[in-house]
Every structure is written in structure tokens, then in C-alpha cells.
């Protein structure tokens, strides 16, 4: 049954927020606050043509309670029965005091239910969502931005919301994804890739309001889960690779009106503007997005988050200075957005080593005194541990001299945290012999080694260190758990004739980066002592670690693996104590919750574009009383799915979604298919991607047979497309790639 409803839109105009960048007016400390006049002028219109905007499908009556306007106490308590925020509570610690599942009995954990969502299986989508659970109902979002309400006890679908994203949307940098939703005040809050913030009716999935946060045509998108707190919905924006001006903003949860917006790039005359060239317009195009869910300390009245890289990512030649507030942990007044403090992890970033991992708040006794801490795991491979009251390091961080490049305008020093790095930070001669091709003869370096016209291969890479997959803190072990990536990336600056200029809505990278051909990618699962920043134990994987971590009172951590496994480790010593193989890459963080005294573990296993993993659409939920030891044990009829899709349709759905309506072998058709399946890794027009080589320079670019073979079967971290694209589509992509050859005009 389809239910079409009228949409209630809240449109807003805020001076200096939505105008053309040329008209942006400097605001004190980059902060803009709504006044009464702004609120009075907010336009409200109904009767939007929702035939072009969204669809809701109701499968059964809503069985649970309606979420209240949660108090600060409710949102700060460690999650037990419910999982109320993306990070479990306002502190983002992903720790649960539920302890019925322990190291002693976790081997008995079995599959309780599986639900197929029927969405987000095309390769361009990534399943990175953390489910929310409130009073027996789970809320999850797919990479296609479709939201489902699910009976958390049985897995039965309650409703689905299916937005129609903006036609022509092509400014998504790093895979189409969403990392979750928020719940509060009877609403489910959703950030969409076309930069809309939407409030859904918790019982029906119908739209109550939506706000166009910014213009996707300029590169603004929303990939993070919003945060509900104190009657407000907080969200940042992604898009640093497109030269946006990053910010964090708060919206009225009842109507969607903007309350405040604080920019992460200071306008001329604002605090921090001295870290940009005086004649630079970098404050309008310099990036510093906020693409992870923030944390809040209600006692201090402070909201915390990390900011992204500068733009252009890899070219510092025209932005001399530290480029605040990029690559920083920031603290703002949660009510007003006013600046409190910042700590910059990378000065003048030219490596795309921005702090992508969500910040985690914790309280711990140090030197006989309880301290309010904040930890952020960086792409650098270090964890930065600060006092969240002042922003000063709780454990020492030293400014040390680093190699210099006059052309890149590098910073003379960089912060070096005291403690252990959780991934290697240099490429050694032994690494070259062990891991790299025999014909490799390039320059090698370490973290903070600059580059210019000649390629330099370094560690860590733009994948990390720690990337977006959330870390966790367990107050019982006093350990911080983090996933790390260890791979080889080469950087080189464009030649003068290829010098990249800013063009609105186009990628603004500034140089070339790519993984070293035929080199291994590895991952780490690491436990660090929060008081010393020293490694307690570490597990090494033969693939990148790209999911997230849950830790519990049962002395366990749970995480997902690229091969589809969800794995449990002993939180104290790292011993593997349980695993279960799903049917797709387990590339999202697990959660836990309790209903009627039974503890559940749940994960969205749907694959990931940048990890190159198999795609799917299922949520897997486990308990000690579960019935199934493997996916093969569960009868197909017992897998929950949208009623209109039978199992045969579900098996075909991934293929159907991935196939172009146009078909054929034309270059234009190939370009469309490329955008949907290849752009995130290889970049626009085959260059500037996040996990793939520059195709324009590839030796096979003019060899159609070799291209078709590569697309069909994949290699290294590239997955095969023979099962998701037709012969005609593969041929079309090959023809498009051949058109990119530098030998053609």
C-alpha cells in the first residue's frame, strides 16, 4: 500500500547564508544567529508537488511509543534498552552498559532476524548507517537515502520513506551514503545528499517539514547523521573536495528554521583569518566541512566536532598559513554557536589527512583528579586526547619541525601526540622490498613529507589512519578502540598546464593522488590506554578496516569486516571470541539494545564503494536465544522484506538497480554509468578519486579489450562488475574511458 502525503515545507532565507558567495557578509567569529525578524519572515508553504519529491509506504501500524523531547539526562546516560543517538548518547562513546552477552557466552550468539531493505545496492551506494532504536522500533537509512522503520524485536518493516533526490545530483565526493538518522519529539530527522534536512513523522514516515540547508550544485551535501538535543537538530555539511565553505548549524526541531550557523572558515577580520593570505578568497572556497555527527556536553553547554580538509586538498601553494579552522577539533556554545576553543591537528594540510573520525567524550581519573576528556582519532594514525573544557592536551602534544617545501608553503611544524601511532607512518626500504612491485623506483617518505612535481609515496594515506568509521571508549577497561588503515599512496602536483582552478560545483583537489599499483592494503583494530595513549593490544587485518566499533559492559567489542563478517573480540586482550558471515561487506558500526530483558546485537551489512566490498541491503540482528548459526540456515521466507518484492526479485534487485535505462555503447551512456559506479574511487573524468588510480594516465586507456577485462573482473581493491553491469554497459564504460585519453582532443 502506498501512501502519498502532502509535504509541509519550511523555506528560509538568512542573510549571508544562502546567497551567492560573492555576497557573503563577514559575521562575528563566523557565527550567524537567527533574530526575531528573521523568524517572522520565514516562509511556510504547503501543497508541494510531492509526486516529484518523496514516497512513503506503510506496512503495518506503528507498535511503539512516540519519542519525547528528550532531556539532557536521557541523552547523556549510556545506552541500555535504547540506542538514541548515532554514537549511542551525546558523548559518542558507543559504549553500552548491557552485559548479558559476555566473553563467556558470546560463542552462543546466533541470528535472531534478518531484514532486506530493498534499497541501496547499486555500487555507487555505501551502507554506513548506525541504526537508532527507541522503545522497540529501529530506524535505519540506506546509501540511497531511503529510511525504514523496523520492529526491532521481529525485523518486520513498519514504514519506508523514499525521497526523490535532486535530478542531476553529481557533487557527491566519496560514495553516495548516509551515516544515520536522529530521533526526538515524535520525529525522525534525516540529512539528504542533495543538502536537505527533513523531519519525518515517527509513526508514519510522512514528511512534516524539510529545509534546504544549502545548494548541492555548489558541492554541499549531507552525509552525517543529524543530532537531536534540547529542541534543536544539529548538522554539518560535506563537500570539501568541491571548495565549499564548511559550517555547523542548528535548526528548530519543530519547524526546521535555522537557529544559528557557524562557519569553519573565518571571514576577513574574524578570529583565525590571519592564517589565510590577506588577498585570498580561500575563506569562501577553502573547505573545512563538518561531515561527522557532533558530540555534546550538556553540563558545559558545549557542542564538539572535527572539521575536514582544506580545498584544494593537495595544493597549498596559494593558501600560505595554517588555514584555520580546517583539520581541527572545534568547541562551540550549543545554544548560540559561539566559538569556545579549537585544536588544529594538521597545519596547512596538503595530504588530505583531515580528522574524519567522530569525536568521543569521556570522563576519567588522571593524577588523582577526574578529568573531562575528548578524543579524536586522526587520519594521521594518532589519537588526539584533549581537555574538553579548555581544548588543552590531557596527554602531551609536541610541535615538531617537519620537512619543508617552499612551493607548497608548508607549515614549519606539526603537532605530534605523545603515545603510539596505531598505523605505520613511514615507508621504509624494507617496505619497498616486501610490498611494492619490483619495478618501483619512486621516492618514498613519511607523514608530513611534502611533494611537488615528482610523485612521493607515503604513509598514512588519505584513507587513514582512522577514517569515518567510529571509534569507541569503554569506561571499564579505560581503553579507546579505533580502526586503522595502512596502505601506500603516491602524491604529485599537477603540471603548470594542468593547474586546477576553482570552478563552482567541480572537484577542487589541486594535485594527483592514487594508491600504488599492486601494493597491499591492510587494517588494524587497536586498543589504546586512554591515560597514556599507548597501545594495549592490536589485531592486524589483510584488508582495510572500514566499519566502526561497539563496546559493551560484557567486556566485548564488535566490529564489521570487509568480507562480510561481524566479529567480537575480548575488549581486554583482543582475543577473537565470535564471528558471523553476512552476505555483503559489513561496513557499518554495530549497535546493541534490549527488549523484554533480551539483549540484541545488530548491524547494517550493505557494502561500501571505497572499500570495494560486495553490496547488499540487509540488517542482521543477533541474540543468545537466536535460532540460526549461519545465513544459510535461515529459510528464505523468514527473511523480512518489503511485501511487494518476492525473493527472486530481491536477488535481481542489485542488478536491476545498477543497469542503465539507456543501455548501449555510447560515450554519453558510459559517462552516466561511470558516475554511478566508478566516480567515487577514480574521480571526475578518471582523475582525483579517493581510492583508485588516475585512469587518464593508465597504460590500458587505449586498449578496449584490457579495459573490458578490468571492469568485468576487477583486481586489487577494485571489485568485479560482471555481475552488476551488462555487457553493453561494460562496453559503454570502456568507450567512455577511452575518450578520456590525453591523446584525444
Residue ranges and their predicted role:
Residues 17-20:
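Bacterial signal peptide processing site
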Residues 47-112, 264-271, 432-451, 515, ...:
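Blade/loop signatures of beta-propeller domains
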Residues 83-87, 125-146, 171-196, 221-245, ...:
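Repeat-blade elements of multi-bladed beta-propeller folds
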Residues 115-130, 160-182, 210-225, 242, ...:
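Extracytoplasmic beta-rich repeat domains
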Residues 191, 711, 722-745:
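C-terminal capping alpha-helices of c-type cytochrome domains
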Residues 591-641:
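Blade-level signature of beta-propeller repeat domains, shared across WD40, Kelch, NHL, RCC1
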Residues 642-673:
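Electrostatic cytochrome c docking/interface patches
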Residues 671, 680-717, 721-724:
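Gly/Gly-Pro-rich "capping" loops immediately C-terminal to redox-active cysteine motifs
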Amino acid at each position: 500500500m502506498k501512501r502519498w502525503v502532502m509535504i509541509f515545507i519550511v523555506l528560509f532565507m538568512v542573510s549571508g547564508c544562502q546567497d551567492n558567495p560573492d555576497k557573503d557578509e563577514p559575521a562575528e567569529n563566523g557565527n550567524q544567529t537567527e533574530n526575531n525578524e528573521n523568524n517572522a519572515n520565514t516562509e511556510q508553504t504547503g501543497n508541494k508537488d510531492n509526486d516529484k519529491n518523496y514516497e512513503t509506504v506503510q506496512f503495518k501500524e506503528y507498535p511503539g511509543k512516540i519519542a519525547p523531547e528528550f532531556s539532557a539526562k536521557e541523552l547523556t546516560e549510556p545506552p541500555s534498552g535504547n540506542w538514541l543517538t548515532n554514537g549511542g548518547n551525546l558523548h559518542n562513546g558507543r559504549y553500552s552498559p548491557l552485559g548479558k552477552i559476555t566473553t563467556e557466552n558470546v560463542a552462543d550468539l546466533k541470528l535472531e532476524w534478518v531484514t532486506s531493505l530493498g534499497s541501496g545496492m547499486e555500487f555507487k551506494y555505501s551502507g554506513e548507517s548506525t541504526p537508532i532504536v527507541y522503545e522497540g522500533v529501529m530506524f535505519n537509512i540506506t546509501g540511497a537515502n531511503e529510511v525504514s522503520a523496523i520492529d526491532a524485536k521481529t525485523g518486520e518493516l513498519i514504514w519506508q520513506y523514499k525521497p526523490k533526490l535532486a535530478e542531476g545530483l553529481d557533487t557527491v565526493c566519496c560514495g553516495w551514503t548516509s551515516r544515520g538518522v536522529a530521533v526526538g519529539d515524535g520525529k525522525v530527522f534525516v540529512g539528504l545528499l542533495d543538502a536537505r534536512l527533513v523531519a519525518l513523522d515517527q509513526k508514519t514516515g510522512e514528511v512534516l517539514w524539510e529545509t534546504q540547508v544549502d545548494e548541492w550544485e555548489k558541492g554541499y551535501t549531507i552525509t552525517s547523521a543529524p543530532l537531536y538535543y534540547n529542541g534543536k537538530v544539529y548538522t554539518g555539511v560535506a563537500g570539501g573536495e568541491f571548495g565549499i565553505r564548511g559550517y555547523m548549524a542548528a535548526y528548530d526541531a519543530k519547524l526546521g528554521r535555522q537557529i544559528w550557523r557557524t562557519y569553519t572558515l573565518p571571514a576577513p577580520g574574524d578570529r583565525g583569518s590571519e592564517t589565510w593570505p590577506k588577498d585570498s578568497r580561500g575563506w569562501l572556497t577553502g573547505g573545512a566541512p563538518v561531515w561527522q555527527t557532533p558530540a555534546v556536553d550538556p553540563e558545559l553547554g558545549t557542542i564538539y566536532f572535527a572539521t575536514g580538509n582544506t580545498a584544494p586538498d593537495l595544493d597549498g601553494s596559494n593558501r600560505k598559513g595554517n588555514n584555520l579552522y580546517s583539520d581541527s577539533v572545534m568547541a562551540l556554545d550549543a545554544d548560540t554557536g559561539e566559538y569556545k576553543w579549537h585544536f588544529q591537528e594538521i597545519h596547512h594540510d596538503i595530504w588530505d589527512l583531515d580528522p574524519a573520525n567522530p569525536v568521543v567524550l569521556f570522563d576519567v581519573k588522571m593524577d588523582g583528579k577526574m578529568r573531562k576528556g575528548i578524543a579524536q582519532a586522526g587520519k594521521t594514525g594518532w589519537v588526539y586526547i584533549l581537555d574538553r573544557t579548555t581544548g588543552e592536551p590531557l596527554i602531551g602534544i609536541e610541535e615538531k619541525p617537519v620537512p619543508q617545501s617552499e612551493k607548497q608553503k608548508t607549515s614549519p611544524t606539526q603537532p605530534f601526540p605523545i603515545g603510539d601511532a596505531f598505523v605505520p607512518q613511514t615507508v621504509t626500504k624494507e617496505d619497498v622490498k616486501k610490498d611494492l612491485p619490483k619495478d618501483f623506483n619512486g621516492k618514498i617518505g613519511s607523514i608530513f613529507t611534502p611533494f611537488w612535481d615528482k610523485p612521493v609515496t607515503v604513509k598514512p594515506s588519505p584513507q587513514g589512519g582512522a577514517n569515518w568509521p567510529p571509534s569507541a571508549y569503554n569506561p571499564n577497561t579505560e581503553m579507546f578502540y579505533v580502526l586503522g588503515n595502512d596502505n601506500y599512496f603516491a602524491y604529485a602536483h599537477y603540471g603548470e598546464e594542468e593547474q586546477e582552478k576553482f570552478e563552482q560545483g567541480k572537484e577542487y583537489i589541486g594535485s594527483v593522488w592514487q594508491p600504488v599499483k599492486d601494493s597491499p592494503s591492510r587494517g588494524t583494530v587497536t586498543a589504546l590506554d586512554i591515560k597514556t595513549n599507548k597501545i594495549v593490544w592490536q589485531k592486524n587485518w589483510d584488508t582495510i578496516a572500514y566499519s566502526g566499533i561497539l563496546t559493551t559492559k560484557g567486556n566485548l567489542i564488535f566490529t564489521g569486516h570487509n568480507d562480510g563478517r561481524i566479529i567480537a573480540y575480548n575488549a581486554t586482550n583482543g582475543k577473537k571470541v565470535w564471528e558471523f558471515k553476512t552476505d555483503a561487506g559489513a561496513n557499518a558500526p554495530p549497535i546493541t539494545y534490549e527488549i523484554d530483558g533480551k539483549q540484541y546485537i545488530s548491524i547494517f551489512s550493505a557494502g561500501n564503494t571505497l572499500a570495494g566490498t560486495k553490496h547488499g541491503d540487509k540488517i542482521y540482528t543477533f541474540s543468545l536465544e537466536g535460532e540460526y548459526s549461519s545465513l544459510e540456515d535461515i529459510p528464505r521466507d523468514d527473511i523480512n522484506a518489503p511485501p511487494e518484492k518476492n525473493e527472486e526479485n530481491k536477488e535481481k534487485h542489485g542488478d536491476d538497480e545498477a543497469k542503465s535505462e539507456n543501455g548501449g555503447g555510447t560515450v554519453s551512456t558510459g559517462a552516466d554509468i561511470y558516475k554511478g559506479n566508478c566516480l567515487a574511487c577514480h574521480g571526475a573524468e578518471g582523475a582525483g578519486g579517493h581510492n583508485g588510480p588516475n585512469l587518464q594516465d593508465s597504460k590500458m586507456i587505449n586498449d578496449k579489450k584490457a579495459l573490458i577485462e578490468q571492469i568485468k573482473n576487477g583486481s586489487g581493491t577494485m571489485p568485479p562488475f560482471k555481475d552488476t553491469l551488462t555487457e553493453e554497459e561494460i562496453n559503454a564504460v570502456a568507450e567512455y574511458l577511452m575518450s578520456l585519453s590525453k591523446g584525444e582532443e
